[in-house]
């Protein structure tokens, strides 16, 4: 996608300029420079560099930045687009339009795929380590605080070194992010309560309903029309994940209710985080959400689990695994939690909330599969069939969604 340059600044020009010999021609940068020097006296035309050639308000960000030279001839400006540096010395090394070719790793599809891969990978590690901690330290409120606290420290250090640069936040953005952070905190705590109360697979079975919550919210809250075909394509996804989870199924009302509350909370967070990204990049958005969410999580952790932790909670955990392993486990589970959520937020910035939710369901298949292997659970035929159905459902959804997007582009082009 070519970045187009729009600038309100006037290009410097002196009166009485003759027209260019070929006003409609688009030439290479070096050819343009020779033509200008040949056809006009020195100082007759001032070329104004735009985009990355100068600093200031003319810097335009697109999928790919291309430098351009604007020449003002009569009432009309013409853009002379240069080829790449290599192309300027070798004719035929680029296409006739002079557009710089997009590198393989700059393709949007590949980049989005990489985000999804890292999201899945980090989430699998987090879920396995998190469940191992709950096996000897069943205090989900405190562990939830540790998850967020490690992430907040990570954000503060990143801001300190300028990676990324901290975006200032005003009162309007704070008001927008506060309810999002509250739902993030509520969804996070209730998810951990469910993970501590039941097996990993059961929690993910209930949370597989998230796409339906997202679809309903997108249609009835945001006013987006979700076609029937997309609704139907979500059915095999949820059914498949549910089937894959049944081999570890151990019903528990606390775990079930907590997972349902988590679904509703994360649905609100996903949709309104998308709105918050209009004025701030996703990395800074998630950093501020983590800080505010930590404040919300502290009171319940102190009042609900504080007395138990001081009496025997910490001592029991240290007696079972040792102080070093206990502290190390808490640190790494917090780090993986923050990283996988950061990547998930970056992924949400690139796709629609419903697509993000379906990807989240497929992620659960990976989590269930790895948890079966790590914790020594037997894999049944039903688990394998359910996994295949879920993957097939995601493929059907992706095909229908891509076809709909292509039809929209064709209508706009017409």
From Swiss-Prot:
**Which residues span the membrane?**
109-129, 142-162, 220-240, 285-304, 383-403
UniProt membrane topology term: Multi-pass membrane protein
Q: What are the record keywords, sorted?
A: Chloroplast, Membrane, Plastid, Transit peptide, Transmembrane, Transmembrane helix, Transport
Question: Topological domains (Lumenal): residue ranges?
Answer: 130-141, 241-284, 404-414
Question: Which GO terms fall under biological process for this protein?
Answer: transmembrane transport
**Pfam families tied to this protein:** TPT
* GO cellular component terms listed in the entry, alphabetical order: chloroplast membrane; Golgi apparatus
Transit peptide, residues from-to? 1-78
Q: Which InterPro entries match?
A: Sugar_P_trans_dom (IPR004853), Tpt_PEP_transl (IPR004696), TPT_transporter (IPR050186)
Can the keyword Transmembrane be found in this entry's annotation?
A: yes
Enumerate the subcellular locations listed in this protein's record, separating them with semicolons.
Answer: Plastid, Chloroplast membrane
Which GO molecular function terms does the record list? antiporter activity; organophosphate ester transmembrane transporter activity; phosphoglycerate transmembrane transporter activity
Ranges in the Chloroplast intermembrane compartment? 79-108, 163-219, 305-382
Top-rank lineage group of the source organism: Eukaryota
Its function, per the record, reads:
Mediates the export of fixed carbons from the chloroplasts into the cytosol in the form of triose phosphates.
Could you say which protein family the record assigns here? Belongs to the TPT transporter family. TPT (TC 2.A.7.9) subfamily.
Q: Please state what the protein is called.
A: Triose phosphate/phosphate translocator, chloroplastic
Q: Which organism is it from?
A: Solanum tuberosum
Tell me the lineage of the source organism.
Eukaryota, Viridiplantae, Streptophyta, Embryophyta, Tracheophyta
